[in-house]
């Protein structure tokens, strides 16, 4: 006979554990428990049946996996938390008694901990770390712009600024930046590093007000972990480029707001690090390295001579009757692969601004423009008001583009193009240099579209040009307007107006207006409803009569398949169909609006 399982000893009750039970098991306070969960990556779980997991109770509680809590029992940082509590109690006791020497001695022996082993546990490979640095970069850039308060220390802000600047220098040096988008929340960037798409947001450098309803203790715990993570990532990235980490900082330039120009990148020499180490075998290998290289070079030369002799002998031999088969690659797959490779390379044109030299006026955001221009190979100088360290002045003749954000320029220099900052971002996102006349100072800028939106097959593409029929409609409307006949171009003359394109509110207003007109004409409401239903039936009948035989068969087949569906499938089908029709109507309305805008533009040009 099978053994009867006791209640609460198996199943969900054993897999999950409540937060209060976890606190008792770990002997930690709630604040320390939250810290260790954030650092170790342990988060609450949602069981399928809360009542079974809570042993029959329906009280609202937070659940964790029992294995995760058991895993935290062996974490060394938990013991450090306990040691820190003892240290804080002794320090407060010494300060209360006025024993300053004892307090200094205790402060010198303050317990500290390292997050290195946690980083290695959570991210076994470098690619795993790259996949998870989006949030880390966003939070580091956020705290780098925060003011120093009693909740945010100066050392924290300075360390965040350093880590962010180091990462930006890597992106500039490796030409990894792909997209940049100006939004209301901030500036979105996307870089491609070792095949991983990394997206982060940088806030604008305005005066920040620290909110009072934010729990900075939890944010500081995340920030502590992200700082350790970015230290590892930056070290690995710099090593891949052969750069010394951390880079040197010019203190004088940094104090005078030089920004990225205050960092000096140096090439690292890994050979002395091996020579001065304690590995004797490495020293022996390096000592015999030259002789090995010489032997390899000589062997390669002998191989080349032998191959030349064999080719000469093959040329002297007569041709044989048996011809080898030539295997040509298929036109489809190979061409598609090559096209995709070429399109990928062209879409990520990393040397877009390599032939240009930019100068930034004092009213433009230097912190962003300097980064994106240098990431695409350009040279940048700026007004002294924006900070020191500019490589050239405003009057330098090497400047090709002058970026400003004002309607009129009092003094213009010959030989340079004056543009607004949006030209830089739009050129980066499209991978080509945009027309500069559209972005001239004081000009109405084209819409700044997000490069992160992927346009579907049937979606509206704002960058797509009008079709030939739509252009004909615009030209016909212009001719009619010139001749004095005002014809709207938002709908075609031969097609009836699509009522579904009108919003619900507008449709109700039109219906109410028709009812009022019928009432004013002396028509009763019941007769008005009958007339509307009759007209609707007539239009449906007219549409059925205009259908071809193939369309009728297709429609009947759809109706039959719909009849064979279950009630659930029929509801789902109608829901999807309604969503598609709504999207189509919305896209048509946007296309009509675009045609109206094109008409107004052409009228302005002609007038």
Curated annotation (Swiss-Prot):
* SUPFAM superfamilies the UniProt entry points to: BRCT domain (SSF52113)
The biased composition feature labelled Acidic residues covers 313-324
Which cellular compartments is it found in?
Nucleus, Nucleoplasm; Nucleus, Nucleolus
GO MF annotation list: ribonucleoprotein complex binding; RNA binding
Which Gene Ontology BP terms does the record give? Answer: assembly of large subunit precursor of preribosome; maturation of 5.8S rRNA from tricistronic rRNA transcript (SSU-rRNA, 5.8S rRNA, LSU-rRNA); maturation of LSU-rRNA from tricistronic rRNA transcript (SSU-rRNA, 5.8S rRNA, LSU-rRNA)
Give all residue intervals belonging to the BRCT domain. 348-441
Q: Name one GO cellular component term.
A: nucleolus
| InterPro entries for the chain | BRCT_dom, BRCT_dom_sf, PES
Keyword check for rRNA processing: yes
What UniProt keywords apply to this chain's record, in alphabetical order?
Coiled coil, Nucleus, Ribosome biogenesis, rRNA processing
Q: Name one Pfam family in it.
A: Pescadillo_N
Which pairs are disulfide-linked? none
Compositionally skewed regions (Basic and acidic residues) per UniProt: 325-339, 544-561, 595-607
- Residues folding into a coiled coil are 497-604
UniProt lists the family membership as follows: Belongs to the pescadillo family.
Described by its record, this protein's role is as follows: Component of the NOP7 complex, which is required for maturation of the 25S and 5.8S ribosomal RNAs and formation of the 60S ribosome.
Q: How does it assemble?
A: Component of the NOP7 complex, composed of erb1/SPBC4F6.13c, ppp1/SPBC19F5.05c and ytm1/SPAC890.04c. Within the NOP7 complex erb1/SPBC4F6.13c appears to interact directly with ppp1/SPBC19F5.05c and ytm1/SPAC890.04c. The NOP7 complex also associates with the 66S pre-ribosome.
Q: What is this protein called?
A: Pescadillo homolog
């Amino acid at each position: 006979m099978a053994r009867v399982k006791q209640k609460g000893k198996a199943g969900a009750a054993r897999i999950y554990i409540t937060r209060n039970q976890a606190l008792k098991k770990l002997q930690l306070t709630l604040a320390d428990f939250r810290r260790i969960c954030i650092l170790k990556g342990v988060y609450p779980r949602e069981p399928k049946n809360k009542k079974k997991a809570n042993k029959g109770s329906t009280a609202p509680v937070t659940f964790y996996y029992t294995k995760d809590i058991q895993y935290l029992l062996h974490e060394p940082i938990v013991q450090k938390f306990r040691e820190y509590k003892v240290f804080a109690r002794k320090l407060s006791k010494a300060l209360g008694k006025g024993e300053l020497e004892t307090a200094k001695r205790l402060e010198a022996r303050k317990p500290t901990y390292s997050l290195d082993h946690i980083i290695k546990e959570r991210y076994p490979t470098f690619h795993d770390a790259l996949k998870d640095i989006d949030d880390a970069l966003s939070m580091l850039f956020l705290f780098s712009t925060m003011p120093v308060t009693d909740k945010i220390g100066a050392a924290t802000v300075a360390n965040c600024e350093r880590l962010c600047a180091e990462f930006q220098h890597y992106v500039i040096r490796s030409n990894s930046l792909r997209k940049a988008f100006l939004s209301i929340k901030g500036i979105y960037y996307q870089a491609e590093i070792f095949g991983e798409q990394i997206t982060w947001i940088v806030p604008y450098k305005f005066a920040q007000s620290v909110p009072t309803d934010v729990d900075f203790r939890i944010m500081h715990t995340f920030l502590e972990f992200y700082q350790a993570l970015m230290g590892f990532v930056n070290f690995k990235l710099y090593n891949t480029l052969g750069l010394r980490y951390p880079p040197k900082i010019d203190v004088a330039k940094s104090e005078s707001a030089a920004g990225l120009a205050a960092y000096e990148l140096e090439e690292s020499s890994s050979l002395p690090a091996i020579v001065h180490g304690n590995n004797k075998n490495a020293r022996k290998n390096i000592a015999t390295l030259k002789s090995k290289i010489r032997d390899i070079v000589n062997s390669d030369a002998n191989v080349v001579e032998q191959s030349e002799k064999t080719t000469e002998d093959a040329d002297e031999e007569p041709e044989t009757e048996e011809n080898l088969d030539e295997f040509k690659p298929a036109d489809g797959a190979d061409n598609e692969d090559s096209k995709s490779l070429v399109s990928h390379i062209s879409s990520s044109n990393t040397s877009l601004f390599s032939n240009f030299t930019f100068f930034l006026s004092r009213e433009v955001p230097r912190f962003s423009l300097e980064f994106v221009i240098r990431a695409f190979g350009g040279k940048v100088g700026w007004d002294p008001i924006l900070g020191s360290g500019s490589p050239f002045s405003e009057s330098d003749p090497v400047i090709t583009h002058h970026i400003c954000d004002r309607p009129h320029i009092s003094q213009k220099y010959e030989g340079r193009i004056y543009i607004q900052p949006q030209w830089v971002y739009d050129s980066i996102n499209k991978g080509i240099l945009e027309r500069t006349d559209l972005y001239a100072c004081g000009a109405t800028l084209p819409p700044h579209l997000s490069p992160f939106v992927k346009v579907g097959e049937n979606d509206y593409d704002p960058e797509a040009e009008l079709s030939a029929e739509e252009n004909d409609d615009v030209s016909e409307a212009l001719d009619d307007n010139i001749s004095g006949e005002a014809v709207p171009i938002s709908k075609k003359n031969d097609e009836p107006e699509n009522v579904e394109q009108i919003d619900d509110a507008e449709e109700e207003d039109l219906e109410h207006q028709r009812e009022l007109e019928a009432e004013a004409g002396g028509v009763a409401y019941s007769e008005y409803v009958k007339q509307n239903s009759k007209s609707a039936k007539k239009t449906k009948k007219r549409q059925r009569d205009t259908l071809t035989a193939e369309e009728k068969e297709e429609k009947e087949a759809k109706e039959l398949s719909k009849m064979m569906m279950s009630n659930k499938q029929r509801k789902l089908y109608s829901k999807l169909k309604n969503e598609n029709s709504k999207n189509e109507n919305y896209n048509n309305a946007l296309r009509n609006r675009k045609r109206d805008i094109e008409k107004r533009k052409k009228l302005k040009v002609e007038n």
